[in-house]
Design a protein with these regions (language model features):
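Glycine-rich phosphate/dinucleotide-binding loop and adjoining beta-alpha-beta core of small-molecule
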Residues: 1-156
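A short structural micro-motif
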Residues: 115, 194-197
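Short pre-catalytic strand/loop immediately N-terminal to key active-site residues, enriched for Gly-Thr
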Residues: 153-165
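Charged C-terminal helix
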Residues: 197-225
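Short, small-residue alpha-helix embedded
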Residues: 107, 163-194
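Short, charged, surface-exposed loops that flank catalytic or proteolytic processing sites
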Residues: 110-120, 181-189, 207-209
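Feature representing long, continuous alpha-helical segments
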Residues: 122, 152, 171-172, 185, ...
Length: 225
């Protein structure tokens, strides 16, 4: 199975939204055509948090989300976009899953991080019921919620995963599982478990501080092999 990318030439800080980089009018269909799952995130610096990239990033993400006709995993700048365009979730035609950490979910809900962490299951369940999506709320015990009220809590994971880039791997694993036919609830569950177990194994070999997110894909491959 091959992963295809729709790169944007604005990861460089010196490029800005006014530089005339248009979103191809067929971008959503180009990304979705012939594919079984989409992942909306970013690689490297969160371009949606930069003034010069925000407008273009928002245009790209909105077009992809509204045009998606395959299950979609929304992470990083996809979540940043939804913080000010939350109703797009209700208008999506395909199933969607969000993978926020508590601070990102705080931006989406207006609830404080402490309140979210005190009521993780309730918050996740209420969000998915309101917006009709799936949610993976990251944390020491990741909570996975479905819009029909089902909730699962992972039993794998460790502090080795609390690093930038770890969540990108998780979103990719979930997307890969969904592309192979898992429904999003199961893809989130299996993906979170594999991600957490891989982190545990790496922490044993390299220590929690020495383990790197870039080592996770290979370790997940070992677990599956």
């Amino acid at each position: 199975m091959q992963a295809d990318f729709l790169p944007l030439p604005l990861w460089n800080r010196q490029l800005c939204a006014g530089s005339g980089v248009p979103l191809p009018c067929n971008a959503p269909s180009a990304v979705c055509s012939g594919h079984r799952c989409g992942v909306v995130q970013r690689r490297g610096e969160a371009v949606g948090q930069l003034d010069e990239g925000m407008a273009v990033a928002a245009e790209v993400i909105e077009a992809l989300l509204r045009g998606a006709d395959v299950p979609t995993v929304i992470d990083a700048d996809g979540i940043n976009f939804l913080a000010s365009h939350i109703d797009v979730l209700k208008e999506m035609q395909a199933p969607a899953a969000l993978t926020p950490h508590p601070m990102e979910l705080s931006r989406l809900t207006g609830c404080g991080v402490e309140e979210i962490n005190r009521n993780r299951v309730h918050t996740a369940r209420a969000f998915t019921a309101e917006y009709g999506c799936y949610l993976l709320l990251k944390g020491s015990r990741t909570v996975i919620a479905a819009p029909d009220g089902r909730v699962r809590i992972t039993v794998s994971g460790c502090s080795a995963l609390a690093k930038g880039g770890s969540g990108d791997v998780l979103a990719g694993v979930v997307g890969a599982l969904a592309a192979q036919g898992y429904d999003l609830f199961d893809a989130l569950t299996v993906g979170a478990f594999l991600h957490g177990r891989a982190g545990e194994q790496l922490a044993v070999r390299f220590g929690a501080h020495g383990a790197l997110p870039s080592q996770l894909p290979e370790e997940i491959g070992r677990l599956l092999g």
